[in-house]
């Protein structure tokens, strides 16, 4: 494979300013061009994109600027002989800090005070409501880049960290690593259950009514994975019934979250618009990955984060 051009698809604008991304790639060694929706591709072309377009299949290589590539038809890329890479590995810090923020918000009741501020109300919490994260247990489901970013920050806050990992292999700062078949055991005693898994056939619908019934009544769910990992109707029912105390949700089965979703109206639900990995340096992080792979193509080495 020989790359003669990198096309920056207009869809990257959903995650970062395209021009800043192009400028970050100015030293790439090949022309870097903005590509609109009618752009055509051919041999020698590489594409950086937020989502899939059929025209990309005529290029040699497509880089997804996100970690999640579930919108890309992997089998079709394989049949077309088009390389596909993703941006996993660069989100640990941002997502880890976001999750730490969620947990601190619930523990210190910051969301309740913000709500009261909007009403110009000097509302004090009930004595039993505020708590500290130190000594509390968090279960991180999925111990890849995202999960480890959460683990390290939770450990720094003095939390007891357990996790769920397909292999069951040990991870630094995680006291116990469970395999997925022991999910209920892993989440049963956790004050927070953090979902940081990719969306696969195995993880779709992984958290539903039985899991909410297993969780502590004072526990909160945090989802920075993918919306369909959780059965949303069961989550609403669990919040309604008091099976769990709250949830911090960055991802949803349907995005944007519909205006009539009952999730908007729970006092102890934090909703963010799929931005847990957002950072003003994102264009630089993705550019570094692309630069690394351009160099690997030149030397014939295996691409970093190759999906197909």
Swiss-Prot record:
UniProt xrefs under InterPro entries: D-isomer_DH_NAD-bd (IPR006140), Dhydh_Halo (IPR054891), NAD(P)-bd_dom_sf (IPR036291)
Entries under CDD domains matching the protein: 2-Hacid_dh_1
Any matching Pfam family: 2-Hacid_dh_C
EC number assigned by the record: 1.1.1.-
Keywords associated with the record: NAD, NADP, Oxidoreductase
SUPFAM superfamilies: NAD(P)-binding Rossmann-fold domains (SSF51735)
Catalytic residue positions: 226, 255, 274 (proton donor)
GO molecular function: carboxylic acid binding; NADH binding; NADPH binding; oxidoreductase activity, acting on the CH-OH group of donors, NAD or NADP as acceptor
One GO-annotated biological process of the protein: carboxylic acid metabolic process
Top-rank EC class of the record's enzyme: oxidoreductase
UniProt-annotated binding residues for NAD(+): 145-146, 224-226, 250, 274-277
Keyword Oxidoreductase in annotation: yes
Top-rank taxon: Archaea
Role this protein plays: Catalyzes the stereospecific NAD(P)H-dependent reduction of 2-ketocarboxylic acids into the corresponding D-2-hydroxycarboxylic acids. Can use both NADPH or NADH as reductant, displaying a marked preference for NADPH over NADH. Shows a broad substrate specificity, although it displays a marked preference for the 2-ketocarboxylic acids having an unbranched chain of 4-5 carbon atoms.
NCBIfam families: Dhydh_Halo
Entry similarity comment: Belongs to the D-isomer specific 2-hydroxyacid dehydrogenase family.
Subunit comment: Homotetramer.
Record-given protein name: D-2-hydroxyacid dehydrogenase
Organism, scientific name: Haloferax mediterranei (strain ATCC 33500 / DSM 1411 / JCM 8866 / NBRC 14739 / NCIMB 2177 / R-4) (Halobacterium mediterranei)
Lineage: Archaea, Methanobacteriati, Methanobacteriota, Stenosarchaea group, Halobacteria
């Amino acid at each position: 494979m020989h790359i003669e051009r990198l096309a920056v698809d207009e869809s990257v604008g959903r995650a970062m300013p395209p021009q800043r991304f192009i400028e970050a790639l100015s030293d790439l060694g090949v022309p870097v061009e903005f590509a609109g929706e009618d752009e055509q591709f051919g041999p020698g072309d590489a594409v950086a994109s937020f989502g899939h377009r059929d025209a990309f299949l005529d290029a040699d290589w497509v880089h997804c600027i996100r970690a999640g590539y579930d919108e890309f038809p992997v089998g079709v890329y394989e049949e077309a002989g088009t390389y596909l890479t993703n941006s996993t590995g660069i989100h640990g810090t941002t997502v880890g800090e976001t999750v730490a923020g969620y947990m601190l918000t619930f523990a210190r009741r910051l969301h309740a005070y913000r709500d009261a501020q909007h009403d110009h109300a000097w509302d004090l919490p009930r004595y039993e409501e505020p708590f500290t994260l130190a000594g509390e247990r968090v279960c991180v489901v999925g111990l890849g880049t995202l999960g480890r970013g959460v683990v390290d920050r939770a450990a720094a806050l003095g939390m007891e960290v357990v996790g769920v990992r397909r292999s069951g292999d040990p991870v630094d700062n995680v006291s116990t690593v469970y395999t997925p078949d022991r999910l209920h055991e892993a989440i049963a005693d956790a004050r927070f259950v953090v979902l940081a898994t990719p969306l696969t056939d195995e993880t779709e619908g992984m958290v539903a009514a039985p899991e909410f019934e297993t969780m502590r009544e004072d526990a909160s769910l945090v989802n920075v994975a993918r919306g369909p990992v959780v059965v949303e109707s069961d989550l609403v029912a669990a919040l309604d019934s008091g099976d769990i105390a709250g949830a911090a949700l960055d991802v949803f089965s349907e995005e944007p979250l519909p205006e009539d979703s009952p999730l908007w109206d729970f006092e102890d639900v934090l909703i963010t618009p799929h931005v847990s990995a957002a950072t003003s340096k994102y264009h630089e992080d993705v550019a570094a990955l692309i630069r690394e792979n351009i160099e690997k193509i030149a030397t014939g080495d295996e691409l970093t984060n190759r999906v197909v």
